[in-house]
Each structure stands twice: as structure tokens, then as C-alpha cells.
């Protein structure tokens, strides 16, 4: 039966423990998530370049009234002592309400997405490139904070998608598990829009080039986290994209829905 409550909360770690934190991210993506389908984690690294500060956080979720003593051991003491941890048995709605209240309104945001195989060296290089380039390019932008989140994607998760009706995205399950990553930039002033968007493009491009050079990259781009200009449908296999175009042409031959829906990614334009 579905749990009436779940174990959920956010742990925060000091930047002096960054290597241990990244070890935990790797181990959960490679071993923890595939081993226990009740467990999920959202590891997010937030950096504030004007303050020369980086914060390491992990939202932990376990879908059971009974907690697992081992699945998050790499994010708890003594392996990795948090400076704060709200992980507890509670209704999911209570957790969502508490975290939603922390989100400020009125700020400007940009997103980009990346994907890679689960590799410890790749995680380190992604982290180092992101932190160093945000610091060098955006330290003078008012209110700038940036984050990168490693979202673990398991082989079983992808297989269930295939079993329920195909794999239009063409994700190569044989290479799973993956990290589908989201980069986020938040800032204050409209006058900084161009600078932040340009930096976001450059940082993402540089990380992708690094991943491709060392065969860490994965082609799929997760639309929900993508940013303006990213070629989402073009990351699908060519045959799948052609099929999607045929389906679109069959059900919207006059492009009524295609043209009336403002913005976003369009199969017709891919």
C-alpha cells in the first residue's frame, strides 16, 4: 500500500567536505539508486560567487514508513556529517509546503540541462568547471546564485518507460545509469540578462565538450530542465524524430496547435 508518510528532508554540508559529497553522489547514482527503488536523492550544489561560498545540499526521499539504515549512509555521519538535516518521517505535503515557502519571488532565472554516464571523474570535472566558470564570469552580477543538480536515472526506470509503450527519446538503456543534470542561474536585475544567458551558454557548452572528449557524455536532453536554444528534439535518434514529425503532421496538418502554442520546443521546427 502507498505510504501515508515518507522519510524526506534536506541535508546541507560544508564546502570543506566537497570531495566526500561528490563521492556520495557517485555512489548513490551508481549503486544506491539501482539497488533500492524506494530511495531517491536530489544532490544540488549552490554557489554564490560574490561571497566566494559554495553550499552542498541533498534532498533525500525514502518511500516507506520504515527507514533504510544504509541507502543514505554516504550522506550521514560518520561518513559525511551534515551541518543541518531535516530528514524525518512526515507527510510529503508538509515537506512541499515548507520548501515552497523558501522560494523567493520576483527573481530572474535561466536553466540548462546536461546528461552524462555515472562516472566519478566526470562528476568532479563537471563540478570544477561549473564552480570555476560561474565565479570567473558572474561574480559581479547582482544577487547571482547558481546551482547544478545531479539527477540519478536508473536502468530500471528507463526500462519501465520502454515496457509501457516505447522509447521515443531513444535513450540507450545499455549505458545506464545516467545523471540528467540541471543548471540554474538566479539573479536580480534585467540589465544582467544578456551576461547571464551568455555565460550559461558558454559554461554548458564547455562542460558538454569536456564530456564528449572523454566519452562521458550522453545525448539525451531532458526537456523539463532545458533552456532557450538547447536542441531538445534533435537529441533524439533521427528515425524517432522523423516518426514524431509524421505524427505531428497527421494530427496538426495546418500547424494550428503548433503555431498557437507560444514558445517552447516544437517537433515541427527540429
Spans of features found by a protein language model:
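Soluble FAD-dependent oxygen oxidases
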Residues: 1-270
Amino acid at each position: 500500500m502507498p505510504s501515508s508518510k515518507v522519510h524526506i528532508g534536506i541535508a546541507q554540508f560544508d564546502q570543506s567536505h566537497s570531495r566526500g559529497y561528490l563521492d556520495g553522489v557517485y555512489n548513490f547514482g551508481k549503486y544506491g539508486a539501482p539497488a533500492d527503488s524506494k530511495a531517491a536523492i536530489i544532490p544540488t550544489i549552490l554557489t554564490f560567487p560574490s561571497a566566494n561560498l559554495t553550499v552542498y545540499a541533498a534532498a533525500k526521499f525514502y518511500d516507506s514508513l520504515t527507514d533504510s539504515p544504509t541507502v543514505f549512509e554516504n550522506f550521514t555521519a560518520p561518513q559525511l556529517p551534515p551541518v543541518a538535516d531535516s530528514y524525518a518521517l512526515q507527510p510529503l505535503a508538509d515537506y512541499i509546503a515548507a520548501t515552497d515557502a523558501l522560494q523567493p519571488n520576483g527573481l530572474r532565472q535561466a536553466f540548462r540541462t546536461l546528461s552524462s554516464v555515472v562516472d566519478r571523474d566526470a562528476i568532479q570535472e563537471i563540478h570544477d568547471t561549473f564552480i570555476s566558470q560561474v565565479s570567473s564570469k558572474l561574480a559581479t552580477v547582482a544577487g547571482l546564485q547558481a546551482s547544478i543538480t545531479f539527477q540519478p536515472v536508473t536502468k530500471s526506470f528507463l526500462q519501465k518507460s520502454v515496457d509501457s509503450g516505447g522509447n521515443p527519446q531513444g535513450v540507450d538503456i545499455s549505458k545506464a545509469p545516467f545523471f540528467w543534470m540541471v543548471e540554474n542561474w538566479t539573479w536580480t536585475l534585467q540589465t544582467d540578462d544578456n551576461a547571464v544567458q551568455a555565460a550559461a551558454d558558454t559554461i554548458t557548452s564547455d562542460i558538454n565538450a569536456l564530456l564528449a572528449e572523454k566519452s562521458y557524455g550522453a545525448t539525451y536532453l531532458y526537456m523539463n530542465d532545458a533552456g532557450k536554444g538547447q536542441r531538445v528534439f534533435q537529441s533524439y535518434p533521427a528515425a524517432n524524430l522523423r516518426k514524431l514529425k509524421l505524427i505531428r503532421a497527421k494530427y496538426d496538418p495546418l500547424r494550428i496547435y503548433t503555431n498557437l502554442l507560444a514558445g517552447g520546443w516544437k517537433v515541427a521546427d527540429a
